[in-house]
């Protein structure tokens, strides 16, 4: 149950009955301090100001119309007009029981929407590097979260699989095949791309053949498409291994590359011209947007077709949004693309809406993110200044975690050691990113992310194993816990309340695409459990009813931690 939404609705009705303006927001929040109750409504001041009356006077009127005696022990007015709500321990215990009995932790059922999530988007014939990490893992956390809530999620891997460079790559692939060197791993493709560029720059005969292949590929030539497909397949087979290592849910079926939209581009340019939105300007086709001004204060021109007939990323993005409405019937489209692309996307979407390609009800959202920086505050690079390949980063994460786990468990079996190191190492890299507000840059620091203290993956994974181990030591089946949850101690209520706040947390993450909110919640939950564990004996509780109640809270904690980490794509292990 979403307590915040429930209280917001109740207080909103009471505000209306008290004569507050129709647009008044109750502004219900979880209280920061226990003396202010469990929840606080902060919207009275704003409403009272509009009405021209003292906030406390309005607050008193609201309380006359507020009926939440079945869920709250006490409701009080504090300060100038805050409404503090103290929830009943009996009611909180009941909500915890409902969560424990439900495989989805009693999450509020949603009206399913079709949500397209555009993320990862590597390029063909290039290895994935650290620049792809944020889009890939933040986008995947969003996909997992929305799927868990019951939405129809369509993952869209917008692969860079089209463009003039493919003439050069096809010509070089042909050359390599003639030299019997056709079987390439993606590691060779990095060198392959450089060698192809070298041939293109230095050999005019090769360059002419490459230009010819571009024309043939765009015209649908079967030979060129076969060679192009081979380049795409080699790339994606290797990328798929990286996705599996990262525990990312993307598959080859999720590829919706630039080539998918290419057949739509001539029609879109013609249509924008026919609608009077696009005009010829210095040989190119341009859309002038009043919403964006250049340095001279004139409408900014957005090129959709170059003088030589070539199309731009903007044209593809216009086609992409149109396709996602017409073919995928999307209600929402979430783009996990870095913040530097914001204006480009906004311009493309402005054209899309002006052209009437999507309905007003369809939401296009740029869930932008900042950069990953080294300890020096500069973009994360190798020591020699090169781009860090994602496979190298994940290898190092595994090695560092292996050293750490081996030190703590010198007698552990090698296979188990490697599995735990894999889960901890990859989890550490992902969690370090996901736990930061995605809109900001963040510092990549091995020591911090692999620490067993603080808001890190190792701490969270250890917290889960610690809670799960209680049940093993109890040697009791969950079905044998027949006594109800009872909250008589402050730490019991604090833990139970935090557990049932999972609903409102995941709702916020789904709405805003902010996995750091889930990380903060899980860290706080783990700390609440620590306080509960230290102050409320579980297995040594003298009263069996109390013992069963506390075991139930421990079980719900383990399930909530595991489910929360799963929405982030972070694995857990049974022991560390």
Curated annotation (Swiss-Prot):
It is found in: Cytoplasm. GO terms for cellular component: cytoplasm. GO terms for molecular function: arginine-tRNA ligase activity; ATP binding. GO terms for biological process: arginyl-tRNA aminoacylation. InterPro entries: aa-tRNA-synth_I_CS (IPR001412), Arg-tRNA-ligase (IPR001278), Arg-tRNA-synth_N (IPR005148), Arg-tRNA-synth_N_sf (IPR036695), ArgRS_core (IPR035684), DALR_anticod-bd (IPR008909), Rossmann-like_a/b/a_fold (IPR014729), tRNAsynth_Ia_anticodon-bd (IPR009080). A motif ('HIGH' region) lies at residues 122-132. Its main location: cytoplasm. This is Arginine--tRNA ligase. The lineage of its organism: Bacteria, Pseudomonadati, Pseudomonadota, Gammaproteobacteria, Enterobacterales.
């Amino acid at each position: 149950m979403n307590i915040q939404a429930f209280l917001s609705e109740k207080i909103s009705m009471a505000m209306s009955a008290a004569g507050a303006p129709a647009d008044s927001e109750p502004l219900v929040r979880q209280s920061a301090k226990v003396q202010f109750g469990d929840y606080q409504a902060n919207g009275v001041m704003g409403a009272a100001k509009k009405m021209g009356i003292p906030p406390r006077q309005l607050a008193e009127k609201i309380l006359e119309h507020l009926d939440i005696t079945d869920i709250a022990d006490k409701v009080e007015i504090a300060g100038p007009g805050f409404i503090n709500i103290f929830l009943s321990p009996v009611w909180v215990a009941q909500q915890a029981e409902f969560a424990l009995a439900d495989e989805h932790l009693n999450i509020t059922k949603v009206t399913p929407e079709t949500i397209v999530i555009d993320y990862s988007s590597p390029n063909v014939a290039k290895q994935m590097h650290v620049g792809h990490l944020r889009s890939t893992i933040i986008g995947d956390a969003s996909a997992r979260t929305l799927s868990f809530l019951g939405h129809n999620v369509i993952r869209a891997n917008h692969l860079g699989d089209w463009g003039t460079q493919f003439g050069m790559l096809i010509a070089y692939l042909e050359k390599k095949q003639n030299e019997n060197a056709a079987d390439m791993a993606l590691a060779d493709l990095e060198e392959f791309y450089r060698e192809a560029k070298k041939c293109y720059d230095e050999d005019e005969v090769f360059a002419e053949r490459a230009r010819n292949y571009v024309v043939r590929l765009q015209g649908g030539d079967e030979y060129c498409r076969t060679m192009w497909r081979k380049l795409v397949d080699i790339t994606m087979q290797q990328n798929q291994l990286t996705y599996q290592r990262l525990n990312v849910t993307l598959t080859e079926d999720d590829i919706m590359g630039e080539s998918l939209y290419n057949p739509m581009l001539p029609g879109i340019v013609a249509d924008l011209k026919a609608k009077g939105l696009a005009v010829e300007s210095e040989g190119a086709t341009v859309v002038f947007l009043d919403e964006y001004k250049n340095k001279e204060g004139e409408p900014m021109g957005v090129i959709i077709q170059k003088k030589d007939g070539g199309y731009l990323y903007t044209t593809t993005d216009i086609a992409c949004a149109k396709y996602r409405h017409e073919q995928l019937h999307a209600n929402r489209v979430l783009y996990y693309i870095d913040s530097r692309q914001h204006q480009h996307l906004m311009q493309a979407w402005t054209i899309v809406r002006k052209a009437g390609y999507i309905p007003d009800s369809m939401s296009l959202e740029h869930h932008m993110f900042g950069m990953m920086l080294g300890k020096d505050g500069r973009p994360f690079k190798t020591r020699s200044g090169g781009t860090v390949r994602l496979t190298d980063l994940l290898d190092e994460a595994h090695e560092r975690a292996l050293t750490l786990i081996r030190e703590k468990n010198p007698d552990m079996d090698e296979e188990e050691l490697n599995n735990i190191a894999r889960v901890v190492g990859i989890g550490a890299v992902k969690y370090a990113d996901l736990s930061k507000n995605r809109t900001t840059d963040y510092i990549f620091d091995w020591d911090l992310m692999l620490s067993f203290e603080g808001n890190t993956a190792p701490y969270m994974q250890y917290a889960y194993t610690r809670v799960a181990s209680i049940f093993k030591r109890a040697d009791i089946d969950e079905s044998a816990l027949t006594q109800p949850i009872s909250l008589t101690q402050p730490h019991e209520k604090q833990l139970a309340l935090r557990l049932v706040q999972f609903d409102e947390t995941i709702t916020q993450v789904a709405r805003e695409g902010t996995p750091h909110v889930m990380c903060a919640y899980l860290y706080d939950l783990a700390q609440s459990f620590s306080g509960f564990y230290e102050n409320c004996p579980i297995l040594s509780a003298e009263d069996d009813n109390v013992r069963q109640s506390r075991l139930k809270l421990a079980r719900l904690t383990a399930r909530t931690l595991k489910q929360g980490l799963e929405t982030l794509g972070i694995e857990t292990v049974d022991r560390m």
